[in-house]
């Protein structure tokens, strides 16, 4: 059964030494598709280059809340144009991150709203990054009627109760390596509650590698460890988890379930 890594950062310098060899090997080993996600202006450019080079890699274009300090109208015009790239399947990752004091919340909120408007205009799903900002994220999304746009809550980290707000908006939940951590009680409670039909699997590579590789560089094939834990929680097989989350990823990003002949 093929793996769909719905959120990775293979443009990261952690892959500079072996990127081509690794990506080709992952594809041979059953990773059918990867969405490489932009976070800054420079990473969006690299993401488009990767998607252009590898048929099984798709792009998401957007500016991470922690990088919104670099945005102005000129650079945002470039983002708007880049989101029209034929292999861009989503606007992201966008959202709010209050873990660090900069950029200030007002700046993050402004560009989050602008990027949500862009997703609506282009009819593309959103990849939402939210950290230590649960209430403001939901409030802004509801104000913008984000449920009409759709998308995924990347690396979901909030409570089971908060999950209900996103379920009501019809959003998917990105689940990755953290699910395998022994201390991830809150996420495990949420993942048990969220229907499998609303879950997609992701790595956030090179970050957040699952057990038994915690602390190492994350790679797409490690998703199988996450699938094993999720299967155990749901009382089904790994194959069922991979099949359903593959279909969910295709629905999320508007891709056909069957691989195109160029992707094989």
Q: Which positions does each model-derived feature cover?
A:
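Mid-domain alpha/beta scaffold segments of enzyme catalytic cores
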Residues: 1-264
């Amino acid at each position: 059964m093929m793996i769909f890594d719905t959120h990775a950062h293979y443009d990261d310098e952690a892959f500079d030494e072996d990127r081509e060899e690794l990506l080709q090997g992952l594809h041979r080993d059953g990773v059918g598709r990867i969405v490489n996600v932009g976070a800054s202006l420079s990473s969006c450019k690299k993401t488009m280059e990767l998607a252009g080079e590898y048929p099984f890699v798709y792009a998401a274009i957007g500016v991470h809340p922690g990088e919104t300090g670099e945005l102005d109208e000129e650079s945002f015009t470039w983002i708007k144009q880049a989101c029209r790239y034929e292999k861009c399947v989503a606007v992201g990752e966008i959202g709010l991150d209050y873990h660090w004091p900069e950029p200030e919340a007002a700046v993050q909120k402004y560009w989050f709203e602008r990027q949500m408007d862009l997703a609506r205009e282009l009819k593309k799903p959103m990849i939402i990054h939210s950290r230590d900002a649960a209430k403001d994220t939901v409030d802004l999304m509801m104000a913008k009627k984000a449920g009409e746009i759709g998308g995924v809550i990347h690396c979901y980290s909030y409570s089971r109760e908060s999950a209900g707000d996103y379920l009501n908006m019809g959003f998917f939940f990105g689940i990755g390596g953290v699910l395998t951590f022994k201390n991830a009680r809150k996420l495990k409670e949420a993942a048990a509650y969220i229907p499998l039909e609303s879950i997609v699997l992701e790595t956030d590579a090179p970050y957040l590698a699952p057990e038994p590789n915690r602390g190492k560089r994350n790679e797409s094939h490690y998703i199988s460890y996450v699938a094993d834990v999720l299967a155990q929680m749901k009382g089904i097989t790994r194959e069922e988890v991979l099949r359903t989350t593959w279909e969910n990823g295709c629905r999320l990003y508007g891709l056909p379930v069957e691989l195109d002949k160029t992707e094989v």
